Amino acid sequence: MAIERKFVNDGFVKASMDEYFAEQLNRAGYGGMELNRTPMGTQIVIYSEKPGMVIGKAGKVIRKLTRDVAARYNLENPQIDAQEVKKPELNAQMMASRLAASIERGWYFRKAGHNTLRAVMNAGALGCEVVISGKLTGARSRVEKFVDGYIKHSGNPVDEVVDEGFAVAIKKLGTLGCKVRIIQPGVVLPDSYTTTEPSEPVTEPVEKPAEKPAAKPAEKPVEAPKKESAAKPKTPAVAPEKPVETAEVAEPEEAEEEPQAEVAEDLEEAEVIQVEGSEELRRQVNGVWQHKHEGYDYWHPMARVHKEAKE
């Protein structure tokens, strides 16, 4: 039981100290405190909208607070530090104190609640909830809630990411409780997720293998051209034509081979002779007599037997 009592006692000291600072520093815009116990002493950090009023002239106010805390809560060597809150709209305790002050000045509770909610959301909060409870408009007490954004109500995230502040507004009909709960901007919630669009696949260019240069064929040694012999080229053999059987010709003579290609020099040297009384032309080439006449207008051996036209 000793350990449990120690934790309960520490919680009581922290809660009562918070109420004491809120009462003493109401005009300075009190915004909460932090309590850290170290071997060197107890460090107390006070967050305020006007840290100059917390310190006082020549440190008069902060020295008085240090003496009172050491005497009330039996703390050894307490050290108090005052820090300024840069965005009061995101501090739940400050906004609850402002809401209570506006209601005490005579503002309608619904107008005061909406103004507080709008100021918190415009500061960039993820969510905000304003709860005003008490005798609002009649003899019976009731509760009015103003919610905007996203708010967690249960689980471990409530203790970690939700900032909560409370203040009391005193009116003629009775007291009104003003509670403000804020989720700070940039907080990562357990159920939050983000979706990313799939990126386009990057197609890498396919590199073609480098083509090897074709191997050059081995050059064959060039042979010197052989000298042509002085002999004249032979003419191709021509199949002999079958002799036409006639009564006048007893034995057919074999047709000589027809030269198809002749050397230009021999053709130029051959002399052409014309037979008297006819159009027949004759010449001698390589010892062979050739002629051409009517019906056979090309040079051919004279020994060739011509086919007679059938009647």
Curated annotation (Swiss-Prot):
Residues 190-267 are annotated as: Disordered. SUPFAM superfamilies: Prokaryotic type KH domain (KH-domain type II), Ribosomal protein S3 C-terminal domain. It holds the Pfam family KH_2. Residues 194-204, 232-247 have a biased composition (Low complexity). The keyword Lipid metabolism does not apply. Residues 205-231 have a biased composition (Basic and acidic residues). One of its GO terms (biological process) is translation. Keywords: Ribonucleoprotein, Ribosomal protein, RNA-binding, rRNA-binding. GO terms for cellular component: cytosolic small ribosomal subunit. GO terms for molecular function: rRNA binding; structural constituent of ribosome. Residues 248-267 have a biased composition (Acidic residues). Residues 17-86 form the KH type-2 domain. Belongs to the universal ribosomal protein uS3 family. Binds the lower part of the 30S subunit head. PANTHER family: 30S/40S RIBOSOMAL PROTEIN S3, SMALL RIBOSOMAL SUBUNIT PROTEIN US3. Part of the 30S ribosomal subunit. This is Small ribosomal subunit protein uS3. It comes from Methanosarcina barkeri (strain Fusaro / DSM 804).
